[in-house]
Structure formats: structure tokens, C-alpha cells
């Protein structure tokens, strides 16, 4: 049975936020530091909404693609946070949240994507632009470094 992806708008939660993820920054011109891109409890919202929706339609597992990145210091990106949330959701509901890529680095993900012939040029994880990678936010820089690392490995092996 084929399932459709359901889009749930949660943007209204952050209408008063000063985060540059909401009030879009021009990272080529503006002076923006990583803290300016922080949205409090963003991942908590994503995972609890996905879990609530899953439980309401009888789906028992939610998959998350969080990886082990340098952003793991943020309170709702840490392994401890994910494990506590997972336990809470299992104890008070019927949904399990699974993190199959949690121990992957961005380079590991790029390597996997290339090995699966994913069109890497169509991927992005931009913190600022929802349509095309900005190329300068921390996630875009990490992505470019990861792809570069993988490609260097392929060149060495030829």
C-alpha cells in the first residue's frame, strides 16, 4: 500500500522568532553566526508532530534522518535528547522513532548517496534557503566538505 507524504505547516509557532532561519538572512552580506540560525525545540516539534500524526493513522514507526554532526551540541540534536524522546514516545504512545543514520557523518551520508546513485546535485540541507543551497550556512558548508571528501577518495582509488 502506497502512503502519501502529508505536509503539516508549523511555521506559525515561530512567527515571533528572531532566528535568521525565519527572517531570511543573506549570508553573503549579513554577519550571521550559528546561534542566529537556532530555532528552539525545532526538532522536538518535528518529531512529536510526526509521532502524533503516525499514531493517529496507525503507523508504528517514524524514521528520522538526523546524523552525527557538529550541530549535535544543540539541546534537541543531542543523542541524549533523541533517546529520551524516543523512550517518552514509546512509554506514552505506540510510536517508535528510529534514527538509522545517527552515527553517520555528513561524509558517510554523501558516500552512501553516491553509491546509491542519488543525484547529489539535487540534494541540500540548507538552513537558510528552502529551495536551493545558499552555499555559506553551516549545513551547506558541511555538505560541500563532505562531497569533496568523498570525491577525493574516489580520485585516490582510480
Predicted feature descriptions by range:
Residues 1-117:
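ATP-dependent adenylation/nucleotidyltransferase module used to activate substrates
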Residues 62, 74, 97, 125, ...:
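Short linear functional motifs in flexible/disordered or boundary regions
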Residues 129-130, 151-158:
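Short cysteine/histidine-rich metal-coordination sites, predominantly Zn2+-binding motifs
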Residues 44, 48, 122-145:
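Local cysteine-cluster metal-coordination motifs and their immediate loop/turn environment
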Residues 70, 147-148:
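Glycine-rich nucleotide phosphate-binding loop and flanking beta-alpha elements
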Amino acid at each position: 500500500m502506497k502512503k502519501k507524504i502529508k505536509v503539516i505547516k508549523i511555521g506559525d509557532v515561530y512567527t515571533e522568532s528572531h532566528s535568521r532561519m525565519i527572517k531570511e538572512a543573506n549570508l553573503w552580506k549579513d554577519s550571521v553566526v550559528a546561534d542566529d540560525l537556532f530555532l528552539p525545540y525545532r526538532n522536538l516539534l518535528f518529531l512529536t508532530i510526526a509521532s502524533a500524526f503516525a499514531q493517529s493513522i496507525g503507523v508504528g514507526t517514524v524514521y528520522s534522518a538526523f546524523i552525527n554532526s557538529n550541530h549535535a551540541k544543540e539541546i534537541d540534536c543531542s543523542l541524549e535528547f533523541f533517546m529520551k524522546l524516543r523512550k517518552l514516545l514509546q512509554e506514552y504512545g505506540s510510536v517508535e522513532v528510529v534514527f538509522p543514520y545517527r552515527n553517520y557523518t555528513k561524509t558517510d551520508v554523501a558516500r552512501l548517496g553516491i553509491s546509491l546513485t542519488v543525484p547529489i546535485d539535487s540534494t541540500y540541507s540548507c538552513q537558510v534557503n528552502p529551495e536551493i543551497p545558499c552555499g555559506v550556512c553551516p549545513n551547506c558548508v558541511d555538505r560541500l566538505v563532505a562531497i569533496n571528501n568523498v570525491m577525493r577518495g574516489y580520485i585516490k582509488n582510480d
